Amino acid sequence: MSANSLLGSLRELQVLVLNPPGEVSDALVLQLIRIGCSVRQCWPPPESFDVPVDVVFTSIFQNRHHDEIAALLAAGTPRTTLVALVEYESPAVLSQIIELECHGVITQPLDAHRVLPVLVSARRISEEMAKLKQKTEQLQERIAGQARINQAKALLMQRHGWDEREAHQYLSREAMKRREPILKIAQELLGNEPSA
């Protein structure tokens, strides 16, 4: 995502502030409204999102509300950006930040001038992570598909005494003749093979 498109999209963001009512929540909501985001604040954490949410700002409490926040985030989309609000740093709080896979952290007391830079960098990080996850899944599918094709080649080589090139040519010819991907031909061939 380019800098211009990222900055331009800030006004379209649906933001949820998961924090008890008070000065911190009020200041954060006000700053997010100044940025141009559509903001809702709620506490305690709901069981699910009632509307789509792009960004969640949530307080991290030492061993409290962690499970509820984790369950809520798991129910969201993989592209939801998460920013932690941290009152103090302790091993338990840092562990929760890592477990929740936060994209950004704002320490308290809240400085309104930190909200925009953290929002922009967290949003960019979450978008990049979502793209990388999608690419990883695609690569895993391709590798699994190639493994199936190689299994089909091995079967043809064993069955007909062919070398790998001949087995590949056979799969390619069948795929072109039937106008199907080679993977589909390989899967059909392997699916028709009696199990040992």
UniProtKB/Swiss-Prot annotation:
Q: Which UniProt keywords apply?
A: Transcription, Transcription antitermination, Transcription regulation
- Gene Ontology BP terms: carbon utilization; cellular catabolic process; regulation of amide catabolic process; transcription antitermination
Instruction: Please tell me whether the keyword Transcription is annotated for this protein.
Output: yes
Q: Which InterPro entries match?
A: AmiR_N, ANTAR, CheY-like_superfamily, Sig_transdc_resp-reg_antiterm, WH-like_DNA-bd_sf
- Stored SUPFAM superfamilies: CheY-like
Q: Write out the GO MF terms.
A: RNA binding
What positions does the domain ANTAR occupy?
Answer: 129-190
- Check the record and name the PROSITE patterns matching this protein: ANTAR
Q: Which domain of life is it from?
A: Bacteria
- Read off the SMART domains from this record: ANTAR
- Is this entry keyworded Zinc? no
Q: Describe the function of this protein.
A: Positive controlling element of AmiE, the gene for aliphatic amidase. Acts as a transcriptional antitermination factor. It is thought to allow RNA polymerase read through a rho-independent transcription terminator between the AmiE promoter and gene.
Subunit description: Forms a complex with AmiC.
What is the designated name of this protein? Aliphatic amidase regulator
